[in-house]
């Protein structure tokens, strides 16, 4: 059975929305009057991005500032284990990775050059700096996703293997963010913090 591109995006939307395990009220996204009507690709994809932003910003705010340098170690899981944890990102590193990835992926979606502020985002250390940078990266991402139109949503992006259209790349960027969101939730729990999505 062949699945259309729009069906694939719809299925991905459902899968990603379900990944958080929480019912959310994302105001100003979909309304009852939208049911059964075509929706612009940018609007549909932006809903996914809004959901991710809500989840990521929630965990970023929930972690105490003094725990931003936390990273799991072998001792966290199995003392004496031969597993190597030397390259595991800290909580701060996970968040700056998401911010940097937002700039990278969404600049490819639109063809825009990322702003100068994106260059040093991975070097930020404090909670306040990281929260501000993360928020800016999501604002940039929302602006770039709005460049997706019915006409260009599935046009090939030259030189980009794997995720080669604006729509599929935008969807992948959200999926990538949820991968790291899941890790951030575990970091919170390892530090006795209940993730906002579980309240």
What are the roles of these predicted feature ranges?
Residues 1-5:
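Positively charged n-region of N-terminal signal peptides that target proteins for export
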Residues 7-18:
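Bacterial N-terminal signal peptides
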Residues 23-26, 65, 114, 143, ...:
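Low-complexity, Gly/Pro
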Residues 23-30, 34, 42, 46, ...:
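Short, contiguous alpha-helical
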Residues 36-41, 126:
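Electrostatic cytochrome c docking/interface patches
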Residues 48, 122-157, 166-180:
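Acidic/histidine-rich alpha-helical segments that form the ligand environment
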Residues 52, 59, 101, 134-137, ...:
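Amphipathic alpha-helices that form helix-helix packing interfaces
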């Amino acid at each position: 059975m062949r699945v259309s591109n729009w069906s694939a995006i719809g299925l991905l939307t459902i899968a990603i929305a379900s990944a958080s395990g929480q019912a959310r009220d994302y105001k100003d996204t979909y309304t009852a009057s939208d049911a059964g009507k075509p929706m612009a690709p940018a609007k549909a994809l932006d809903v996914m991005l809004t959901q991710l932003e809500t989840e990521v910003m929630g965990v970023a705010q929930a972690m105490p500032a003094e725990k931003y340098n936390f990273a799991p170690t072998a001792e966290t899981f199995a003392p004496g284990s031969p597993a190597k944890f030397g390259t595991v990102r800290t909580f701060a590193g996970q968040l700056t990775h998401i911010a940097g990835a937002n700039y990278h992926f969404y600049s490819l979606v639109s063809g825009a050059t990322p702003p100068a502020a994106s260059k040093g985002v991975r070097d930020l250390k404090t909670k306040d700096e990281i929260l501000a940078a993360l928020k800016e990266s999501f604002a940039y991402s929302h602006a770039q996703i709005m460049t997706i139109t019915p006409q260009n949503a599935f046009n090939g992006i030259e030189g980009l293997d794997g995720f080669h259209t604006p729509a599929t790349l935008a969807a992948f960027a959200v999926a990538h963010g949820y991968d790291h969101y899941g890790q951030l939730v575990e970091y919170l729990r390892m530090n006795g913090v209940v993730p906002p999505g579980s309240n």
